[in-house]
A protein has these predicted regions:
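Catalytic alpha-helical scaffold of carbohydrate-active enzymes acting on polysaccharides/glycoconjugates
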Residues: 1-136, 141-186, 212-233, 239-288
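Glycine-rich, positively charged active-site loop/lid region within alpha/beta enzyme cores that binds
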Residues: 182-203
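Surface-exposed cleft-lining segments at the edges of enzyme active sites
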Residues: 134, 197-209, 237-238
Length: 288
């Protein structure tokens, strides 16, 4: 249950007008397995997912380095196993690794014990790479289980970034508070750039990068004018990592910076939200 919100007048650091999170879901071909349920998923579709680790990730990391941005990558455990070198590059660049399922399993109704086992397995893999406790959670395909927040609190998570019920960060109360950093389908590159022959219900053509730039710029301007909001972009190296798209994203970053954005990673924003509400992360829980 949500019992505390911080949206009423939070002041972002250094007088910034809005908190912007450039988050990346590095799920490679496992995103496509989830979306299609492996229905007629041929190698062409699989290879589209593999574009992320093979090509797109490097462009994303290079752009982030040029702009001196440290952010959050949500990585399924199985991806960290298969593409260990690439995930090590993410961590070595100073970016946070956060939970995104073990096998990007998005089935509703996964038994709680099974999901907790998935969390433990994926956490161990990510922590072995980064040397840091996993404190962030994003449900695969946004399929947050009914017990999801309770399980995050039990396992000492600091924040979640799945729900879509408002434009500000808020706190799931409990013995161990968990900050929610909401996303929105309109801020997800999947909504504009995903392509698959395997499923008639998915997008079958991509939007021009300039169209997406203008949509995100307009949304940023309006949210920044309100002064207490967040804008959480959900990006995929296999999609945004195409050459013209990453150029578009970098142009957007420059515009946002010039117009009052605080661009930060999820953990940093979550800790700030807790502090602004007179709360602190449970150090013992987070250190587990």
């Amino acid at each position: 249950m949500i019992t505390l919100k911080n949206g009423d007048g939070i002041k972002w650091p250094h007088g910034k007008r809005i908190a912007v999170l450039l988050t990346f879901d590095f799920d490679a071909e496992y995103l496509r397995y989830s979306v299609t349920g492996q229905r007629a998923l041929g190698f062409s579709d699989i290879s589209r997912g593999q574009y992320g680790p093979h090509e797109g990730l490097k462009r994303c990391l290079d752009m982030l380095a040029r702009q001196n941005i440290k952010t959050t990558f949500f990585v399924p455990g199985i991806v960290a196993e298969k593409y260990a070198d690439e995930v090590k590059q993410i961590a070595a660049a100073g970016h946070e690794l956060a939970y995104h399922g073990y096998a990007h399993d998005a089935r509703p109704g996964i038994p709680e014990a099974e999901e907790e086992a998935n969390m433990a397995k994926a956490e161990a893999i990510l922590e072995a790479i980064s040397g840091k406790k996993v404190v962030g959670h994003r449900a695969p395909l946004d399929t947050l289980q009914t017990y999801g927040v309770k399980l995050m609190q039990k396992r000492g998570y600091l924040y979640s970034s799945t729900l879509k019920d408002c434009d500000w960060a808020y706190i799931h109360e409990g013995e161990h508070p968990v900050v929610e950093l909401p996303t929105e389908p309109g801020f997800d590159d999947f909504s504009f750039f995903y392509f698959s022959y395997a499923d008639a219900h998915t997008i079958t053509c991509s939007y021009p990068a300039e169209y997406v730039y203008n949509m995100w710029k307009d949304a940023f301007d309006e949210l920044a004018n309100e002064g207490d909001k967040i804008m959480c972009l959900k990006l995929h190296p296999q999609l945004i990592g195409r050459s013209s798209r990453i150029r578009m994203l970098e142009r957007l970053v420059l515009y946002m910076r010039q117009n009052g954005a605080w661009i930060a990673g999820c953990e940093e924003v979550a800790r700030y939200v807790l502090a602004q509400n007179g709360k602190e992360a449970d150090a013992d829980a987070v250190a587990k």
